[in-house]
Design a protein with these regions (language model features):
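C-terminal flanking tails of non-heme Fe-dependent oxygenases
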Residues: 1-84, 89, 130, 136-330
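Core domains of carbohydrate- and sulfate-ester-processing enzymes
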Residues: 79-105
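A short, charged helix-loop
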Residues: 97-127
């Protein structure tokens, strides 16, 4: 089982909590977080609205088809996203910061723009705007604890998120099937930090341990599942670990609903490299290199790479990028 951390422990014993936080991210790269302060009513609301959206007919969901969005926002049908060139068996909505399109934008700045919001169910936009606010605050709080635990100033990461952070919410449903095992293929998250809400009873998430063994990660009551992204691994010279994970497709007559929240910095931000204390640096594994999935210094380059690979239909339709077949999940 993954480590379980209680954020309320930081109120009485900040040093002890920070040590446990650092070591969980070093040893596994994944942990459960309880005592996070997000109200149960807010959690229940976003899960209920997610269910209501996915229960609608296909033509209603496709009113906000991602094919209409050069910014890769909106609804993706089942099979509309790829990981490692293979189809993921899920449907989803992608929600980012609502901003004006930049005229004449090039490269990753083409990711900036408006969301495609569903007209139903009622209250969907307001609920997920509030969700973004709550989880951004929670994620930044964790980052400050990590910074101190690594020997840095508490605010060392703040500047990267101060203006125009490129956060991302995915509202995801995995339908049951007997035709494939890939709900989402094995991957690492390309950003900084992920906070995952899983509907109670929704199984299927697996995490790869350093030994190569895959373990099941069932939802835990009142907990978020938290994992490290590649940029935080780079920032710590590999001391903190971005861990490969996947979701198995549910069996027939079942499904799985989850809402991952990706805490990402501004598109043009570069995450600072932490000068680790000697005793931590000695335990660093170094950054894992993948020639098929390079990690760039600025977040936007990583985001653009991930989006265009994961959604080749949108990339080709709006940006003239031919499918390469070597996609990765975001």
């Amino acid at each position: 089982m993954l480590p379980v951390l209680d954020l309320t422990d930081a109120d009485d014993d900040a040093a002890g909590f920070r040590t446990r936080l650092r070591e969980a991210a070093h040893d596994v790269g994944f942990f459960y977080l309880v005592g996070h302060g997000v109200a149960q009513a807010q959690i229940d609301e976003v899960l209920a609205l997610s269910r209501k959206f996915f229960n609608q007919p296909a033509d209603v969901k496709n009113e906000i088809s991602q094919l209409k969005s050069p910014q890769f926002r909106g609804y993706s049908r089942i099979g509309g996203e790829l990981t490692n060139g293979e189809v993921d068996w899920r449907e989803q909505i992608d929600i980012g910061p609502d901003r004006q399109v930049i005229d004449g934008a090039e490269g990753y700045w083409r990711l900036q723009g408006p969301n495609l919001w569903p007209s139903s169910p009622d209250g969907f936009r307001a609920a997920f705007d509030a969700w973004d606010h709550a989880l951004s605050a929670l994620g930044l709080r964790l980052l400050r604890h990590w910074a101190v635990s690594l020997g840095a100033q508490e605010d060392v990461f703040d500047a990267a998120f101060a203006e125009l952070p490129a956060t991302l919410i995915k509202v995801v449903r995995y339908p049951g099937t007997a035709d494939t095992t890939q709900g989402v293929g094995a991957h690492k998250d390309s950003g900084v930090l992920t906070l995952l809400l899983v509907e109670p009873g929704s199984e299927g998430l697996q995490v790869e341990l350093a030994s190569g063994q895959w373990i099941d990660v069932p939802p835990l009551r009142d907990a978020f599942i938290v994992n490290i992204g590649e940029l935080l691994e780079v920032a710590t010279g590999g001391y903190l670990r971005a861990t490969r994970h996947r979701v198995l497709a549910p069996p027939p007559n079942t499904d799985r609903v989850s809402i991952p929240y990706f805490l990402n910095p501004a598109l043009d931000a570069t995450i600072p490299i932490i000068a680790l204390p000697a005793e931590l640096a000695a335990r660093s594994r170094g950054v894992e290199a993948d020639p098929n999935n390079p990690i760039y210094s600025s977040y936007g380059e990583n985001a653009w790479k991930s989006r265009t690979r994961a959604h080749p239909d949108v990339a080709e339709l709006h940006h003239g990028i031919s499918p390469r077949g070597n996609a990765s999940a975001y």
